[in-house]
């Protein structure tokens, strides 16, 4: 079996399910290993339903958050390649990274709605099939 962060989280959740895995001091959000594993499994399953296959690139336009970690791990669990996008970049820069990396799916947070709407409006220039 290939070892990746998804496999490691699954093992840790089995060993210490109630131990805290994530703490956000700015919002007091806390997740146990069981919760983080379950949430990343949900994302992995959603990506599989979209037809994402091992080796395909999935871009993340998310702030530093539990959602970023859950998505990152979910992508790893199915063998996808994470393409993290810097929140400081503008649409032209993001378009270049998305196209250059071969990204076919983009997961984004509401903070990125305006820039993603701009990118989506550019159509096939980005080759993203799932927004």
Regions found by a protein language model. Give the residues of each.
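Residue-level preference for short coil/turn positions at secondary-structure junctions
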Residues: 1, 16-18, 54, 99-102, ...
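Active-site-adjacent beta-strand anchor residues
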Residues: 2, 61, 106-109
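Short, flexible loop segments at the rims of nucleotide/cofactor-binding pockets, characterized by
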Residues: 1, 35, 83-85
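Aromatic/hydrophobic pocket-lining residues that form π-stacking "cages" and hydrophobic walls in ligand
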Residues: 9, 71, 116
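Structural core segment of the AMP-binding/adenylate-forming
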Residues: 49-50, 77-131
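Conserved AMP-binding/adenylate-forming core of the ANL superfamily
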Residues: 18-65, 69-73, 90-95
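A short N-terminal helical cap/helix-turn-helix that marks the beginning
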Residues: 1-22
